[in-house]
Amino acid sequence: MSAEKAKTIKSEIVIVGGGMAGLTAAIGLADHGFDVTVIDMVPKGDLTAVSYDGRASALAYASCQLLEAIGVWPYMAPYAQPILEIRVSDGPSLLHLHFDNETLGDGPLGHMVENRHTRIALFKRLEEFDNIRLLTPEKVASISRDKAGVCVTLESGTRVEADLLLGVDGRGSVVRRHADLPTSNIEYRQHGIVCSVEHEHSHCGIAHERFLPSGPFAILPLTGNRSSLVWTEKSHLVDTIMNLSDRAFESEVARRIGGFLGEVKVVGGRWAYPISLQYAHSYVSDRLALIGDAAHGIHPISGQGLNLGLKDVAALVEVLVDARRVGLDIGATSVLDNYAQWRTTDNAAVYAITDGFNRLFSNDIGPIKLARDLGMAAVNEVTPLKNFFMSHARGTVGELPKLLRGERLAP
């Protein structure tokens, strides 16, 4: 990997956004022979700092297959906790959904990895390529596109000329705004409070999701006797909770977990993030494509946010490799439309499911509560339906790109 800052850099693909999806895209593309430049406004050291992001991500089985195929997983594996079971409950109800990896019999449902360790692994793999340039910290000043290509001018004066621009720069995407791609937004008036805990008893690789009137409360297993918590709460209460003393906050956390993990202790910081649904009406424009949160940001209720972004990556890499093989322009709208058509339907289904589940479970109305409890009991008893939900959790439903099946692409 080279990190020089020339006045004009010529590259096949320029990526704005050096987060987890952006770096995965860079590696996937470079691993298949493309010359790639990545731009991010945050210094590399900050992206891997303990204080930058306290979140952990549930990586579906298919996402892990992708990361293995492009050589990232060996750097992540020591920090990855297999998810062997998922238990979903409706508040204090004794009825619950239970998903067990042994039912499908071909590996865990997924893995939990702290975002910091994922970023470190991605940077380690990035350094093995001489066809990736990383420009950071750099801020985009302007973007221009024409039939010949795209030019991204940075505030430092550096210009990056390329055939294709990828916007992987999050919900507030500069690239999406430049392309004037409209979005729809739903505000849930909820925040996700995130922290990690150490606990006395083993989690046994089980992920728990409890639906409470204020929103879901997730207990997600990490390596060792540790878990990551995602506590969804009504936005107007979040400042009060975040300002609690360490002892009072820990007491609230322990009360919500219950006693099954024994004594619990909050370790590290606590973070709060607003929760909303946002999706672009189109993922592509001339010589431009959106990936990940720049295209779609969803409720964390399903743990699928990063997985959707990695599916985008796998699909786009396959589309571009196929186009290059037959001599097509990788920035052509006809090529990029293949990517958009592949991903739009799958992503839209996830928007609808996560939005519906959040609305269905984030209340305590008696008849609705009874109906959803009976629904969970029915899913537990109907094996094909239960297996369908498990396959969704593993990311193995639908027309999967080859990389999500762990297969490399022919040049």
Residue ranges and their predicted role:
Residues 30-52:
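Glycine-rich FAD pyrophosphate-binding loop
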Residues 239-333:
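FAD/FMN-dependent oxidoreductases across multiple families
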Residues 8-9, 68-69, 79-178, 186-191:
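Conserved N-terminal helical subregion
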Residues 318-411:
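C-terminal helical "tail/cap" subdomain of flavin- and related membrane-associated enzymes
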Residues 53-77:
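N-terminal glycine-rich dinucleotide-binding loop that anchors FAD/FMN and/or NAD(P) in oxidoreductases
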Residues 21, 44, 172:
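Conserved Rossmann-like nucleotide-cofactor binding loop
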Residues 67, 149-153, 158-270:
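Conserved FAD-binding catalytic core of PHBH/FMO-like flavoproteins
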Residues 11-38:
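N-terminal Rossmann-like FAD-binding beta1-loop-alpha1 element of flavoenzymes
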